[in-house]
Amino acid sequence: MAPFPEEVDVFTAPHWRTKQLVGLYCDKLSKTNFSNNNDFRALLQSLYATFKEFKMHEQIENEYIIGLLQQRSQTIYNVHSDNKLSEMLSLFEKGLKNVKNEYEQLNYAKQLKERLEAFTRDFLPHMKEEEEVFQPMLMEYFTYEELKDIKKKVIAQHCSQKDTAELLRGLSLWNHAEERQKFFKYSVDEKSDKEAEVSEHSTGITHLPPEVMLSIFSYLNPQELCRCSQVSMKWSQLTKTGSLWKHLYPVHWARGDWYSGPATGLDTEPDEEWVKNRKDESRAFHEWDEDADIDESEESVEESIAISIAQMEKRLLHGLIHNVLPYVGTSVKTLVLAYSSAVSSKMVRQILELCPNLEHLDLTQTDISDSAFDSWSWLGCCQSLRHLDLSGCEKITDVALEKISRALGILTSHQSGFLKTSTSKITSTTWKNKDVTMQSTKQYAYLHDLTNKGIGEEIDNEHPWTKPVSSENFTSPYLWMLDAEDLADIEDTVEWRHRNVESLCVVETASNFSCSTSGCFSKDIVGLRTSVCWQQHCASPAFAYCGHSFCCTGTALRTMSALPESSAMCRKASRTRLPRGKDLIYFGSEKSDQETGRVLLFLSLSGCYQITDHGLRVLTLGGGLPYLEHLNLSGCLTITGAGLQDLVSACPSLNDEYFYYCDNINGPHADTASGCQNLQCGFRACCRSGE
């Protein structure tokens, strides 16, 4: 349902506060030691205050919302008659008054948990009903101006309650230092009645609605947000809102530059002196001996400054990974770690796992390896990526490009093209193992076995496969593809079982499949067993074929799903008929004509001298890179013109002005491409570095 205009949405703001309170008491309930009397009583007092606020909230709703709605609609009655708030308050009072010892506390705790769980199950849907049912009715029976006036009164009533500030403090503060300080202050210097009355009716910044606070926080930089998060629990939760952390620049932040806007003007290369300083920092940090004697020389002082900067960067990265990204990672669009002195492959792997919606990733001149991309382990896990800069990452090999290509996803148009091919070339193959007989297609039917159904459900002689496998139901189990000429040792499968392998797939060479794309060299695929990429999640046949020399061969795949229950194994499975009139496999959404994968616009592998033609051809899988405009392969010494041609043919939007590769390669667009950018470069690989 589309959200209602903010000015007339009378439920969302108060309900946000109420839902926060529900989350807080659930968290406290799980952390309370019921054997400890102090913890037990503190929890009950907190719950009592929370439910008093719930009671106040519903009284305001009854008077200013439900009551007015009942006057105009006869269908509304007894909205808050069965919410059990009074019963819960009585339960808390009983616990505070009557429970005396540890045995009674533990018995009471069991009852308390059951009652709270039951209340929460009813209370949250009740709020949802108000937002989805009563709000539209309000829009129907009241004018826009009337609703604006109602919302103002509701917010004012929530803010004017005497106990609101105290409830906020009681629910937000876990340490008792502030409470002791307040007690001491007011016991020594009591305020006059007049001052107390004024303070009760004053409205401070803590009473502002959450949406207003978020608007204020949006003007703060990351350092200021971190300071605000220490003010109170409420502010701590607000500062962890994803919209405040869309763009991350940890390397700049560690050096005092707290910019956190979009990545504009960051693509220009720094001068060599700046790069040298970053390298010196990295070297000093890695060579630093914590137990070494202190050297007071000028050179040592400069080195200690470099070490302290790198240490600051490392602490900042750890803080982001453990304290910020678990909450806001899905909202992060930009991550710039260029020239980082402290970042490691493990850190990058953790960050990428927490940030699946990245659009701009800059890892220029970092000391990462292929393992940094291990978290990109399934098809389309980072399909929003538009800018990827790996310039100067000398440890990057083809393995990383395999993971990157898989993470970019697969084009919808590419999927549909292969579905048409598959329906015309379906052949049946029988795999018999004792009493189990299975049938699959030569190319694509094996993916049906990746659903959660058991063998007994999938193999039914009377009910052929008719339901397409959509991407929404796909659970991405592991799929192991083996070369039929070089099968794995049985000991290897033990390790796979520990890695939660759910399916096993055997690949056989088939010669009757020809790629539909022109210019294919029809070479066989070799070494699939040794490829790390294909030993991960393999979710699409279109990802295994393309119109280039790397993959113009067919495969017949035979799949055995995870072991079913014993009863299923005892039954003899009948051969399964495959309907040819319908699509057997479906990858993608019918609802959108716009591509959601492989939208990369910028790719720089400058100085990645270990990249080969294999890595370039991997990028053509799944539909190529149709939107790529900028491609920098300067310093990639081992690639050839054939590999470049294969990649360029899969990049129809490539701009020759931003296409860079070694001058010694006789490749595509030789007259219009921009050549090598690394000539006489002091910090990037180049075949002419010594000149």
Swiss-Prot record:
Region span, Hemerythrin-like: 1-159
Binding site for Fe(3+) 2: E58, E61, H80, H126, E130
UniProt activity-regulation remark: An iron-sulfur cluster promotes IRP2 polyubiquitination and degradation in response to both iron and oxygen concentrations.
Organism: Pongo abelii (Sumatran orangutan)
UniProt cross-references to PROSITE patterns, sorted A to Z: FBOX
Protein name: F-box/LRR-repeat protein 5
Keyword rRNA-binding: no
Binding site residues for [2Fe-2S] cluster: C662, C676, C686, C687
